[in-house]
From Swiss-Prot:
Biological pathway: tRNA modification; N(7)-methylguanine-tRNA biosynthesis
Native source species: Escherichia coli (strain K12)
Recorded name of the encoding gene: trmB
Stretch list, region Interaction with RNA: 150-155
Name of the protein this chain belongs to: tRNA (guanine-N(7)-)-methyltransferase
Residues reported to bind substrate: 148, 180, 217-220
Amino acid sequence: MKNDVISPEFDENGRPLRRIRSFVRRQGRLTKGQEHALENYWPVMGVEFSEDMLDFPALFGREAPVTLEIGFGMGASLVAMAKDRPEQDFLGIEVHSPGVGACLASAHEEGLSNLRVMCHDAVEVLHKMIPDNSLRMVQLFFPDPWHKARHNKRRIVQVPFAELVKSKLQLGGVFHMATDWEPYAEHMLEVMSSIDGYKNLSESNDYVPRPASRPVTKFEQRGHRLGHGVWDLMFERVK
């Protein structure tokens, strides 16, 4: 796995572009198990960043619906979903290598062949590597809420990002978000409702109950312990 996880973008003259990141790089120390997984399982399940569009049938060796998960943390819920839905393919993106190592170790232990992972900035991956109209679902669970008002612009869910996601979804594909921070849920709802071509799948036109397909994550468990609610939003691409 390459170490240049986050690559700068450049303009047409080769000058680097400054873009606000939605995450802070917290590399962390790899455990021996995570290091072993990165060394041994990355060559099979890892996908290096490039500026070439992915060919999903070639990547997975078959034609199947593809779900992209952005920011999978340690990968527990992503591995659980891939295990429960062997007829579907999953691509996970995470910027922190300990999480990637943990996910690879779990996926190997479960013997999964329908999961691939990347260690890179998801926005760059969407721009450079994900073909338009190719995804059945995009999942964004418990992204950093950037609580302070002056940091709200760092939240990943903004209009340009949601438009980018829509372009990568197939017609009928779904963008599924979840957060345990109510102001961020309200922000997500405002952003998504402002974009033409998305349909809110909530009967009350706001939030949906947690789908059975989404495993309860450690972040959700933490939220429950702290007395927080959890808000799921699901928006379908309709045009």
